[in-house]
């Protein structure tokens, strides 16, 4: 799933 990490980037 895609989510916003602490840096505001998208992780798959």
From Swiss-Prot:
It comes from Nautilus macromphalus (Bellybutton nautilus). This is Uncharacterized protein SMPP4. Nacreous layer of shell.
